[in-house]
Structure formats: C-alpha cells, structure tokens
Amino acid sequence: MRVGLLFGGCSGEHEVSIKSAQAIAKALASDDNQTKYQVSPFYIQKNGVWLGPDVSQQVLDQGVPWGDQPVTAGQRWQFPPEAARMEVWFPILHGPNGEDGTVQGLFSLMQVPYVGSGVLGSCVGMDKLAMKMVFERAGLPQVNYMGVERGEIWSNPCVFPALCEKIEAQVGYPCFVKPANLGSSVGIAKVRNRSELEAALDNAASYDRRIIVEAGLTDIREVECAVLGNENPQASVVGEITYDSDFYDYETKYTDGRSQMHIPANLPKAVVNQIQTMAIQAFKAVDAAGLGRLDFFYQPTTGQIVINEINTLPGFTAFSMYPELWRASGVEFPSLVDRLLQLALDYHGRPGHQ
C-alpha cells in the first residue's frame, strides 16, 4: 500500500514535525511494515510549497528545514505528481494548517483516507475555546476560564482596563493567557498581577484573534493519557510530566533535560481509572479518531482531576509522550504506526467519515 508521509508545514512547530516524520519513517521501514507499506515523503516548506519525495527524503535525512524561496500564490496550488498515487496519508503536521482541519479537509475533498481525526474533530481539538465549550457540554470538569477577542485588547484603549477588571473578577490570579489556536505552549504566559496580564494579553493577541484566559491551580501534577481507536477507543497507561520551570512552556518542552516523563505515573489506581475514563469521554466528545493525547491536572490534596486539553495530532518523535505511553502499554512504535494506518483505512474509508 502506498503511504504519503506529510510533514513540515507553515506553523511554528515545523521543526518538531520533521522530527516526528523521521521517527515514523523509521517505524515504517521495520521488517513487518516494509512488507505492507511503500512510503513516499512529502515536505511542505514554511512558505506553503509542497516538495516531492526526492527532496523530501533529503529533508528527512538531514533533519533540518529546506530553504524557502519567494513564491507566488499559484505555486501553492501545485502538488507533486506523486501525491495523486498515494492510497493513504499519514499527516504529521503540528499546529495551524496541519492539525486544525485544514489539511484534513483537503484529504477529505480528495476522498483519500488519512491518519487522525476528521475535519470537525481536528478543528475542535485545535481551538481551545471551542474545545472547552465541548468539554463543558460533556460534563468534564475544567478550570475556570473566559474567552477574549483581539479587538477587545487592541481596538479601544478605553475598553482594555475594563477587560482586565473583568478577568480579575471572573478568573483571578494567578492565571494563564493563551492564544486559542496554537500548540506547543507558544505564546502562553503565566500572570500574577495587572501589569503581567496586560503584557500577556498583548502578546497573545499578536498570535491569534481569539485568546483564552484560564485560572491557575496550585500544588498540581500534570498527567497525560494516550487514546487509540475510532468508535471504540482504548486508553493507555497514565504518564506524568515534571519540570523545574514555572510552567510547561515551549523552552521547557523542547530543551533536553528541562522536563522529565514518568511512565507509568505513580498514582492511586482509582485516579488512573478515572483519568482513563475521562480521556475516552473527551476523545469522543470532540469527535476525534485514530489518536489523541489527553492532558489533565491532578490535585492530590483535594483529589480533584480536571481536563486541560486534547491534542489530536501529538508529537510523534521516538521519545514523545504519546508513543512512550503506548510502549508502556505493550504497543511498540512500529506496531503503533501500523495500527494508526489501519484505523485510517477503517474510519476515513467509510461513507460519512470523510
């Protein structure tokens, strides 16, 4: 079966996508997978231009982005001719224009199966405000939050102080300010007072027109659970992230030695069971498919578990949390990649799931 491995993309998570694609390509080259799949890599430059398998393989081999050249709008409509021959796609594009329903819409339009959630699940999984509304409707406990529009921050200086007062009254300090549609903790800030709030809102507005402000919790443990499947998804063991920084920001995530994964997490069995149940509930609530990583906060002093977010296309390097959780659950990396491709054929190959 001909598999298109799509990576790179126009988001700030371009380099992470390359690393994920390298790991997936290696897994597809395993003895068992080589007999099933013929892989062709396709790299999307930061300027949005698709490159064919020959150059894309060079990017995989070198592990660094391909140099961009000035392009016209018409060049972004040109796809490598080899793309038309792919029977199933494995998109590993992180962030905007990759896991937000855009490329999923393209594949759906072309009526070709692909790994991961469909357009709806991807959209809801990317937009933190929409996601929280869906979680709320599903009865999943969350931290207190409120949504903010860029226009409330930039358009009228007289409105801005009133907005800050509203946030202080409804959410309070400490709180986190986040762009609604970015991943990997890009643009996120922890704030403790009015001056930090003003700066964080201004910064978040430079990334997105929709911003979310969430209440901060104290004495929490950050735990994660991986989900695999379509209509009858399974939950992995639960893992925990620890770090020395103030919060789990971009630098902490992607700097060696700044954070540690503990798999499985040292948690009471009842807590693990509850997290796994909530993970599957959240996965279904957003209409996810194939894979998803669910992030939670656990407060040992109160026993409270609240859902933070779902990532419908999580990092997929050899040492990323998602594959590591499944490895600890008895599913090795090559088998995981194989199962995801089979789930794609099962889900997106049927009517009503495009």
From Swiss-Prot:
Tell me which cofactor or cofactors this protein depends on: Mg(2+); Mn(2+)
Q: Identify this protein by name.
A: D-alanine--D-alanine ligase
Sequence ranges assigned to domain ATP-grasp in this UniProt record? 132-342
Sequence positions that bind ATP: 168-223
Report the source organism.
Synechocystis sp. (strain ATCC 27184 / PCC 6803 / Kazusa)
| Keyword Transcription regulation among record annotations | no
Recorded GO MF terms: ATP binding; D-alanine-D-alanine ligase activity; metal ion binding
The signal peptide here is none
